[in-house]
A protein has these predicted regions:
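Conserved RNA-binding domains used in RNP assembly and mRNA/RNA metabolism
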Residues: 1-84
Length: 84
């Protein structure tokens, strides 16, 4: 399931997956096909990288919510293009 999240000051839409059994302070979740969103649209995140899975610490995520239908559609469009 995709989520809208605020990660280190960036608004992202991504599939979020928990990594079980991690130590405190270690990266404990995976963001898949993350894209940064704003009023102009969406771009792959992080910029300048072709990585589609980012291992991050959940403590760097300050907000988690359901994305709007518009940003969900943008996310799936970008994901489809990156999978090609």
């Amino acid at each position: 399931m995709i989520k809208l999240l605020k990660f280190d000051g960036h608004w992202l839409v991504a599939e979020v997956e928990e990594i079980p059994g991690t130590e405190l302070g270690d990266p404990d979740c995976v963001l898949k096909y993350a894209c940064e969103v704003n009023e102009d649209g969406a771009l792959p995140f992080p910029a300048y990288s072709d990585d589609t899975e980012l291992v991050v610490r959940s403590e760097n995520i300050t907000v988690i919510a359901e994305p709007s239908s518009m940003f969900s559609a943008l996310y799936y469009d970008l994901k489809d293009k990156r999978e090609e």
